[in-house]
C-alpha cells in the first residue's frame, strides 16, 4: 500500500455529483426532444433537443475520468483483493438493489403504458431475455460497466504500478495535442471494431448485455484509465485543471460536428462510427473544460454541497422511474414543453429528495443503496449529558 493525499478533492466530488444529477434534466428533456424514447411529448422542442444533445455528448466521458481517478486512489489505499471487493460492493450492491425495487416496476409500468403487455407471452425466449436485459439494466448500465472495469483494472492497475516502480514518473510529459491524437486514434479504433462487428454479425449489436459489457466498456475504458493517470501524474491533472481556450474552442466545434452527424447521419451508414470518433475527442476536451471550471468554482467544502454529493447516487437511481411516470401520466396534460420540463424537474427532484431522506432512516435500505456497511460511531453510544 502507498500513501495517498490527505487533502480532499472537493471539486472532483462536486463535479461527479453534478454529472450524476445532470441525468435528471437529461432524461426529462429527452421526453420533450425529437429523439424517440419510451415516452414523448406531442410536439418536440428544438431547444430542449439541443440541451439534451449537449449533456449527452460529454457527460459520461467526464464521469468515468473522475471514477478512474478515485478508483486508483483507493487502489493505493487497500490491498488488491480488498480494493476489488470494496469497489464492486459500492457499485454492484446498489445496482442489484435497484433492479427489483426500481427498474422491474418501471418495466412493468412501461409494458402497460406502451400497450405491450398482451404481446409479451408471444415473444421468443431470446427476445424476452434481451428485452429484460435492456429494460432491467436501463439507466443502471454505468454501474455494470464500473464492475467490469474494476475487474479488468485488477490487472491494468497492477501493470501501471509495476511500470511506475521501474521508471521516473517525474519525467513524464503530457500535452493536450498528444492526448488528442491518442484519443482520436482510440475513437477510430472503436469505430473500426464496431463496423467490423456490424459487417460480420450485426444482430449482436442489439444484444443488451453485449452492448453494456463489451461495447460500453470498450468505449469508456480509456477515460477511466485517463482518470487513474491524472491521479498518478500531477502534471496531467494540472493540464486538465488549467483553463484552455484551445480545448474550449475545439469542444465547441466538436459539438457542432456531433449535432450535424445527428441531423444528417444515418444509422444504416456511418452515423454511429462517426459519433464514436467525435465523442471520444469531445469527451477529452470537455474534461479540461469541466475540470478547470469546477476547480475554479467548486473547490470548497460546504454542508449543502456535501449533502448532494452523498445523495447524488440515490437520487440518480430513483429519478428514472419517476421521470417515466411523469412522462407517461402527467406530460400529456401540460401543453407547454418548457412548463412541462420545469414541472418535471420539480416533481422528480422533490420526490427523490423525500425518498432519500426516508431511506437514510432505514439502515438496510441505506446499505443497499450505497454498498457501504452502516458503521455505528462511538459517539452514538455515549450517554446523553
From Swiss-Prot:
Its EC number is 2.1.-.-. It is a multi-pass membrane protein. GO terms for biological process: glucan biosynthetic process. GO terms for molecular function: acyltransferase activity, transferring groups other than amino-acyl groups; transferase activity, transferring one-carbon groups. It is found in: Cell membrane. Pfam families: Acyl_transf_3. Signal peptide: none annotated. Keywords: Acyltransferase, Cell membrane, Membrane, Transferase, Transmembrane, Transmembrane helix. InterPro entries: Acyl_transf_3_dom, Glucan_succinyl_AcylTrfase, Glucans_biosynth_C. The chain crosses the membrane at residues 17-37, 60-80, 91-111, 137-157, 173-193, 212-232, 239-259, 274-294, 311-331, 338-358. It is an enzyme of class 2 (transferase). GO terms for cellular component: plasma membrane. Pathway: Glycan metabolism; osmoregulated periplasmic glucan (OPG) biosynthesis. Necessary for the succinyl substitution of periplasmic glucans. Could catalyze the transfer of succinyl residues from the cytoplasmic side of the membrane to the nascent glucan backbones on the periplasmic side of the membrane. NCBIfam families: PRK03854.1 (NF003014). Belongs to the acyltransferase 3 family. OpgC subfamily. This is Glucans biosynthesis protein C. The gene is mdoC.
Amino acid at each position: 500500500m502507498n500513501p495517498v493525499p490527505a487533502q480532499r478533492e472537493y471539486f472532483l466530488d462536486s463535479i461527479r455529483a453534478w454529472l450524476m444529477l445532470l441525468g435528471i434534466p437529461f432524461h426529462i428533456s429527452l421526453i420533450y426532444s425529437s429523439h424517440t424514447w419510451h415516452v414523448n411529448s406531442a410536439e418536440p422542442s428544438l431547444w430542449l433537443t439541443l440541451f439534451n444533445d449537449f449533456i449527452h455528448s460529454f457527460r459520461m466521458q467526464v464521469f468515468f475520468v473522475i471514477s478512474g481517478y478515485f478508483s486508483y486512489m483507493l487502489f493505493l489505499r487497500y490491498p488488491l483483493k480488498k480494493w476489488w471487493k470494496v469497489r464492486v460492493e459500492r457499485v454492484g450492491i446498489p445496482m442489484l438493489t435497484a433492479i427489483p425495487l426500481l427498474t422491474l416496476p418501471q418495466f412493468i409500468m412501461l409494458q402497460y403504458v406502451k400497450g405491450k403487455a398482451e404481446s409479451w407471452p408471444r415473444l421468443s425466449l431470446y427476445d424476452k431475455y434481451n428485452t429484460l436485459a435492456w429494460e432491467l439494466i436501463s439507466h443502471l448500465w454505468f454501474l455494470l460497466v464500473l464492475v467490469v472495469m474494476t475487474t479488468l483494472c485488477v490487472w491494468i492497475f497492477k501493470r501501471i504500478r509495476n511500470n511506475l516502480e521501474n521508471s521516473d514518473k517525474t519525467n513524464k510529459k503530457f500535452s493536450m495535442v498528444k492526448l488528442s491524437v491518442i484519443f482520436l486514434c482510440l475513437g477510430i479504433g472503436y469505430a473500426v471494431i464496431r463496423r467490423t462487428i456490424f459487417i460480420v454479425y450485426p444482430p449482436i449489436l442489439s444484444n443488451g448485455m453485449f452492448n453494456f459489457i463489451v461495447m460500453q466498456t470498450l468505449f469508456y475504458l480509456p477515460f477511466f484509465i485517463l482518470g487513474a493517470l491524472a491521479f498518478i501524474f500531477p502534471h496531467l491533472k494540472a493540464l486538465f485543471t488549467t483553463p484552455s481556450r484551445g480545448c474550449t474552442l475545439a469542444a465547441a466545434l466538436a459539438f457542432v460536428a456531433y449535432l450535424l452527424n445527428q441531423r444528417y447521419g444515418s444509422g444504416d451508414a456511418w452515423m454511429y462510427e462517426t459519433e464514436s470518433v467525435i465523442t471520444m475527442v469531445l469527451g477529452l476536451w470537455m474534461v479540461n473544460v469541466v475540470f478547470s471550471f469546477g476547480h475554479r468554482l467548486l473547490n470548497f467544502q460546504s454542508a449543502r454541497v456535501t449533502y448532494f454529493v452523498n445523495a447524488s447516487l440515490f437520487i440518480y437511481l430513483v429519478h428514472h422511474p419517476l421521470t417515466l411516470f411523469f412522462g407517461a401520466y402527467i406530460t400529456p396534460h401540460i401543453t407547454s414543453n418548457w412548463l412541462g420540463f420545469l414541472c418535471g424537474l420539480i416533481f422528480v427532484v422533490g420526490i427523490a429528495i423525500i425518498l432519500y431522506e426516508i431511506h437514510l432512516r432505514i439502515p438496510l435500505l441505506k446499505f443497499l443503496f450505497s454498498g457501504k456497511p452502516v458503521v455505528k460511531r462511538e459517539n452514538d453510544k455515549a450517554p446523553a449529558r
